[in-house]
Curated annotation (Swiss-Prot):
Record's protein name: Large ribosomal subunit protein uL16
Gene Ontology biological process terms from the UniProt entry: translation
Entry annotated with the keyword Ribonucleoprotein: yes
Species assigned in the record: Bombyx mandarina (Wild silk moth)
Keywords for the protein's UniProt record, in alphabetical order: Ribonucleoprotein, Ribosomal protein
Amino acid sequence: MGRRPARCYRYCKNKPYPKSRFCRGVPDPKIRIFDLGKKRANVDDFPLCVHLVSDEYEQLSSEALEAGRICCNKYLVKNCGKDQFHIRMRLHPFHVIRINKMLSCAGADRLQTGMRGAFGKPQGTVARVRIGQPIMSVRSSDRWKAQVIEALRRAKFKFPGRQKIYVSKKWGFTKYERDEFEKLREEGRLANDGCIVQYRPEHGPLDAWRKVQAEILNV
């Protein structure tokens, strides 16, 4: 018996049903990699950030997430280079979907019980997505903006429903807009922490404050 089409599980009808000690025997999700590209790139290297945002309240299968990830990555590697971007999948398939298997062979009516005891067995996993929630995000340099938008446009065809491509005003994956980020960086208020930054506050323990002030003055 083949896999049931994902259109049967498109809508969020029931409560979240995650894997637990009560829900065992769940198949592994098809998507296993959620960050790819130049993951270790400094926060200063990739100021551009583009999101693929869902426009519907629905469920996306782990197979669809994997297909979208592969499609986006393949286009960017071919047109930009493998070290010119960082893709991050923003959804994780935690919701378990079930299937009540029915026999379709001859004499099946004597073997199966129909809708008696119809609570199905786990079949796969999906991610529940809300309206306005990012599905995947890409950070890169400003010169690759057109290529990043085209890669996300191609990835849209792997998902059901409607999606929008949103060019963020923020610097990379940080929470600061570009003007604010550059201003805080000039003041020495930001400390690089991988693909994000940590803010150095004006308040706190006196020793920590003196240490931060000394570093800012040295900068």
